[in-house]
């Protein structure tokens, strides 16, 4: 008898639309793999939704606040339901970009220096000498990211806007020039290295989730030494935060710099849309999408 899997999607964060696409793709992949699937648009009555669905396993396809910051994971722990991706602590740590980087630096992984600032103060005057990146400390998918280039007279005015709904805590981080690289990790296995060439100013929300928004080159045209280093750092980051299942680590690479690779971010619930990087790397390594989501479901766990 096949397992009954509830796929959590949608949710309440600004990344809801992306999560719906990820969830639909994962639900189809799981059905193709032979599982019974129930799709849940996760809302404020998630406890009742889970009770009604009564799944054997929960596939967490949520993105952003509430879905990948440890909160939903805590609910699933309470109900004793095995779930995919990282647990409560790793999810909460990774979602807090600055705290995650404190842990990663302690593990010897190079990350750009940054400071936490109130968004209203950061909108009035530079709190770090440009160039720097200003972004919400606890959002994903490059939502609300601003690059402040050298010579800029003022910070982004949007940070002080009344329309801003991404939290008052801003991470101001040194801008690292170079090429965009990313590595997906399946438990202790780094898949490969992809170079991302966005067709916008940087790899923003539009570039990530719009067809044609970016070009993905895999394997990345880099030396074997740098590829090995990127994959090693991605696995070390995965372990340092106590992650499980699948993660994706994003890097900047500058061959002329003393430190050629900087880890920008680790994503504990990488996108699984048709344009997403992690499933693309898995397929390059010979893992079909249905096999990938089946592996994630079979490796789901609780209280880890």
From Swiss-Prot:
One of its GO terms (cellular component) is cytoplasm. ATP binds at residues 128-182. Mg(2+) 2 binds at residues 265, 267. Its EC number is 6.3.2.4. The keyword Endoplasmic reticulum does not apply. One of its GO terms (biological process) is regulation of cell shape. Pathway: Cell wall biogenesis; peptidoglycan biosynthesis. Its cofactor is Mg(2+); Mn(2+). Keywords: ATP-binding, Cell shape, Cell wall biogenesis/degradation, Cytoplasm, Ligase, Magnesium, Manganese, Metal-binding, Nucleotide-binding, Peptidoglycan synthesis. SUPFAM superfamilies: Glutathione synthetase ATP-binding domain-like (SSF56059), PreATP-grasp domain (SSF52440). It is an enzyme of class 6 (ligase). Residues 101-298 form the ATP-grasp domain. It comes from the Bacteria. Belongs to the D-alanine--D-alanine ligase family. This is D-alanine--D-alanine ligase. It comes from Maricaulis maris (strain MCS10) (Caulobacter maris).
